[in-house]
A protein has these predicted regions:
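Basic, amphipathic alpha-helical/coil surface patches used to engage anionic, phosphate-bearing ligands
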Residues: 239-240
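Active-site pocket-lining/capping segments in soluble small-molecule metabolic enzymes
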Residues: 1-12, 16, 30-150, 157-234, ...
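As written
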Residues: 25-26
Length: 311
């Protein structure tokens, strides 16, 4: 029998809902992002035999666990079918609702003048603004102690470099927690190096509204590391040389890091050639291939992601 998992879109926020789905044969529930650590612990206590999964990293919807209609309204692309256009992150102007006795506000999207959307605001902020990204790596040990079975990283529309780097960092935190080691704060810095919209702990703990929302910037903030290439193969009869498919600009003299499942390698690029064996100093545009000299000793490297770092 194929196991059935319940999507976060079902908005499971309490033990009664978990038991309801368990009685109908589901094997795992992905809990709503809006739950606190205490609420998650209570659900686990009341539902000891159900697999529970929680989101710990990635983009956050402004709507309740992704139940958003903005993308469908503006562009006829359903956010709940993987086609979200991130309408919540567009540039809006706020207008007083002069005809509204409640004293509310209207939003006007920059490219749709004259189309006004009513919004509501309370002590927690405006529900249509740009959310920061979730980052809960510092809470993994507590979530593991609670008894969560699986952690989920939101990676839709992200590159496989982003997913690989994020998963690698969270794996380090999981292994440290299993070994009863203290949380290593440098993992927070590693995640800062990735492109992000600013980070928040989400609803795991209670914060003021400005902790959750990014009111100043719509666009993703570029990190201090950039994915510049992907390993295609080792160069025959040339020890340490790898063929790289170029993704972004890099050059001789850059500080690089090679991400691999068996461990990362940091080095300064000293030699690069085109596919004809002619020395070059700057990688050509995206999609081209180059050969570079690395500290790799293996003779049959088939996978790796190349990252340019600062310093």
């Amino acid at each position: 029998t194929m196991p059935i998992h319940l999507s976060v879109q079902a908005n499971t926020v309490n033990a009664a809902a978990v038991k309801f789905w368990q009685e109908r044969g589901l094997t795992r529930v992905i809990l709503s992002r809006e739950l606190s650590l205490e609420e998650i612990a209570e659900i686990r206590q009341q539902c000891p035999d159900m697999e529970l999964e929680v989101f710990v990293h990635g983009a956050l919807c402004i709507a309740y666990s992704g139940r958003c209609l903005l993308s469908g309204y503006f562009n006829h692309r359903d956010a709940n079918q993987g086609a979200c256009t991130n309408a919540c992150r567009w540039n809006y102007q706020v207008h007083p609702a002069r005809q509204d006795e409640t004293g509310g506000f209207l939003l006007e999207e920059k490219l749709r003048p004259g189309e006004y959307l009513p919004i509501e605001e309370d002590e927690h902020g405006t529900y249509i603004m740009n959310s920061k990204d979730l980052r809960a790596v510092q809470h993994l040990a507590q979530l593991m102690a609670i008894g969560i079975d699986s952690f989920k990283i939101e990676g839709r529309t992200k590159s496989h470099y982003y997913v690989a780097r994020t998963a690698q960092i969270y794996r380090q935190a999981i292994e440290a927690a299993w070994a009863n080691k203290p949380f290593e704060t440098h993992l927070l810095t590693e995640l800062e190096n990735l492109a992000n919209r600013g980070y928040t702990e989400g609803f795991f703990r209670r914060h003021t509204h400005d902790h959750h929302q990014n009111y100043e910037l719509r666009n993703t903030q570029l990190g201090r590391q950039q994915w510049v290439g992907e390993v295609m193969a080792t160069v025959a009869e040339q020890s340490g040389w790898l063929t790289i498919e170029v993704k972004n600009h890099f050059a001789v003299g850059d500080q690089l890091e090679l991400l691999r499942p068996q461990g990362n390698l940091k080095f300064q690029l000293t030699q690069m050639e085109n596919t004809m064996g002619i020395p070059i100093t700057v990688a050509p545009g995206s999609g081209h291939q180059v050969n570079i000299k690395t500290p790799v000793l293996e003779t049959n490297v088939r996978f790796g992601l190349l990252v340019r770092t600062e310093g």
